[in-house]
Regions:
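Small-residue-biased structural context
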Residues: 1-135
Length: 135
């Protein structure tokens, strides 16, 4: 397993841990709000890392691999949806941190993020390792 994949998995584990912590805490408490902000920063940093180090490698390989190109297209569309809904959630929290629908929204967003991480690790990570092992 490459160092990049190890780092990527570690970032995923940290994101999943913070998601779990927020779910276990009172989301309206000071600690819950602090964890939400930690989650937001972690997600932003992780997405930037993926955009700089992970997806360029896969996009280059997809130039000659139509199956991978199709898979990346679907993942990109999915990520656009998740990112938009996650940004909307954090805007809602910033504007009304005590909104009664915040806990339910967070559970929904958490499920989307967890599902995305699972799919990335089980599909894209394997593709990345396949591509980088050919070099």
């Amino acid at each position: 397993m490459s160092d990049y994949i190890k780092m990527w998995r570690k970032e995923h584990a940290q994101i999943l841990e913070v998601l779990l912590q927020v779910l276990q805490l009172d989301i309206f408490s000071r600690v819950g709000q602090t964890k939400l902000q930690e989650l937001k920063r972690s997600l932003e940093a992780h997405l930037k890392s993926e955009d700089l180090g992970f997806f360029p490698v896969l996009k280059k390989a997809a130039e000659t691999d139509t199956d991978l190109r199709r898979e990346l297209f679907l993942f990109a569309a999915d990520m656009d949806k998740i990112a938009a809904e996650t940004r909307a959630f954090f805007r809602k929290v910033e504007n009304d941190s005590m909104g009664k629908d915040i806990p339910a929204e967070f559970r929904r967003i958490s499920a989307m993020i967890k599902s995305r991480i699972f799919r990335e690790e089980n599909l894209l990570m394997k593709e990345y390792e396949k591509v980088t092992s050919r070099k």
